[in-house]
Design a protein with these regions (language model features):
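Non-catalytic terminal extensions of PLP-dependent enzymes
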Residues: 1-133, 257, 307-329, 335, ...
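Single, functionally critical "micro-switch" positions that shape active/binding sites
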Residues: 78, 140, 245
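Conserved PLP-enzyme active-site core in the AAT-like
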Residues: 113, 143-309, 396-397, 424
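A short, small-residue-rich loop immediately preceding and capping a beta-strand
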Residues: 132-138, 165-168
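General small-molecule cofactor/ligand-binding pocket signal
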Residues: 135, 188-190, 414
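Short strand-loop junctions, especially beta-strand C-caps/beta-turns
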Residues: 139, 193, 217-219, 387-391, ...
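Short, well-ordered loop/turn and helix-capping segments at boundaries between secondary-structure elements
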Residues: 154, 158, 182, 209, ...
């Protein structure tokens, strides 16, 4: 049987003389490049670009696109990432010429519509957070973390307080300690207890007058709401420290509880997880931060302000601001999508988002926990962490094998081996946009995988052009450009 396979690289499809278009002959006499461009500015030889027809190029990229997994085509239970479906109307609205044709160097008087939208978004995000002021500048969730910690640092410097430490749970996202370090703090780890919650005894032992903040994700990364958050906030405030809430899991509590009401003093949002910003692709992104009034003077300048006459302006008169963290107004395209999502859902809709996210996660957990036990909690919030430890011990089937084999069933793998406090972790987050039927199919597939021949699973996926690349080698010795040598192929 012969099968027409598309070569993996355009360079391998190249044929001399092949072209995407044939142009008519020119009646302008040809001149050598050397006669028009100084020799020192010319390359010694033409670039080795592939020679292809238009069909070759279109077919190549179409085949690549069908090899990708996406939320539009596949169930995508990638825990801690909230890979929910983003309404296409928000994409259409974000492409309106009235938005895309504007330029940040325009006079503010010609940007009143955009500034009004951004000002209203600031107010929406402040209300959802239960906090007082918002900056839209940060360009990603991680930069939002860093910005908020820089704000905290400026606040304590203004108070002449030398605070050098940030407390971080051992189940936290890796960006938390990285952001603390970049902001000039020492990251101090707080252990989890047997329930998967903050070990309060360890927290109390490490809380002192050098602590600037405690970074808590609530619900946390094992999918549990930590009811100790009120006591944690009280103890921090008694010591003059701040409670930082990582907003990565806001999808679980929208409209049900506000971080400010839990005692949080500052937080960041991830619009790509909660408010229909695009996922991945290297950006652009957004990571707005919300803070209490005492921290508001230190927010990045400018903020969008509304004057008494109803006009909007950029407020640069902020002498205690930490300064800019992003050019212009932030990534307005992503912020506009967030605005559209919040507007279209309304308060009741946002609460329903959280309710359905929690319902779906709990339903799916009950379907799979006898195959892959869930070590923490009888119930969960928006996600849960199952463990393939028993399968690995008894049958040699590891979390990675399960994740890879799911791809053969057109299901994206869950997050594996995170958080580190769960051995053979499978972090599963179905989100609110999936139907019951999808969850039940996932559970059936997981059960089938658990009964398969382990030797066959070790080579999965079997349906992809490449099964298991050497990920360690790729991380240690990445090849970032093609040069035609065999090891690059």
């Amino acid at each position: 049987m012969y099968k027409l396979d598309t070569p993996s690289l355009l360079f391998e499809s190249s044929r001399p003389g092949r072209a995407t278009a044939i142009f008519p002959g020119s009646d302008v006499p040809a001149r050598p490049l050397e006669a028009m461009i100084p020799a020192k500015q010319l390359a010694p030889s033409p670039p080795p670009l592939p020679e292809l027809s238009e069909l070759d190029v279109v077919r190549h990229y179409t085949n690549l696109s069908t090899s990708n997994m996406s939320i539009d085509a596949n169930f995508y239970p990638l825990g801690s990432c909230t890979m929910k479906y983003n309404p296409k109307r928000n994409e259409r609205l974000a492409a309106l010429p009235g938005l895309t044709a504007q330029h940040p160097y325009q006079d503010e008087g010609t940007l009143q519509g955009l500034l009004a939208l951004l000002h209203e978004l600031q107010e929406f995000l402040a209300e959802i957070a239960g906090l007082d002021a918002v900056s839209l500048q940060p360009a990603a969730g991680a930069q939002g973390e860093l910005t908020a910690l820089l704000v905290a640092g400026a606040y304590f410097r203004d108070r002449r307080e030398s605070r050098t430490k940030v407390l971080i749970p051992d189940s936290a996202h890796g960006t938390n300690p990285a952001s603390a370090h970049l902001a000039g703090f020492e990251a101090v780890t707080i252990k989890s207890d047997a329930r998967g919650l903050v070990d309060l005894a360890d927290f109390k032992a490490k809380l002192d007058d050098k602590v600037a903040a405690f970074m808590i994700t609530n619900p946390n990364t094992v999918g549990l709401f930590d009811p100790q958050v009120g006591e944690i906030a009280r103890r921090l405030h008694d010591r003059g420290a701040l409670l930082y809430l990582d907003g990565a899991n806001m999808n679980a509590i929208l409209g049900a509880v506000r971080p400010g009401d839990m005692g949080a003093d500052l937080m960041h949002y991830n619009p790509h997880k909660t408010f229909s910003g695009p996922h991945g692709g290297g950006g652009p992104g957004a990571g707005p931060i919300a803070v209490r009034q005492a921290l508001a003077p230190y927010l990045p300048a400018p903020l969008v302000a509304r004057d008494d006459d109803g006009t909007y302006r950029l407020d640069y008169d902020r002498p205690r601001s930490i300064g800019r963290v992003r050019s212009f107004f932030g990534n307005t395209g992503v912020l506009f999508r967030a605005y559209c999502y919040i507007r279209s859902q309304g308060p009741d809709g946002l609460k329903a988002v959280a309710q359905h996210a929690v319902l779906n996660a709990n339903y799916l957990m009950t379907l799979v926990r006898d195959v892959c036990p869930v070590p923490f909690g009888e119930r969960c919030m928006h996600e849960f962490v199952a463990s393939a430890r028993s399968l690995a011990r008894d049958r040699g089937i590891r979390a990675m094998d399960i994740g890879k084999r799911l791809i053969d069933h057109n299901i994206h793998a869950p997050t594996v081996y995170f958080p580190l406090i769960v051995p053979e972790a499978l972090m599963i987050e179905p989100t609110e946009t999936e139907g019951r039927e999808t969850l039940e199919i996932f559970a059936k597939v997981l059960r089938a995988i658990a009964e398969e021949d382990p030797a066959a699973l070790h080579d999965a996926p079997h349906s992809t052009p490449i099964s298991r690349p050497d990920e360690v080698k790729a991380a240690k010795t990445p090849v970032l450009k093609w040069n035609g040598t065999p090891e690059n192929r």
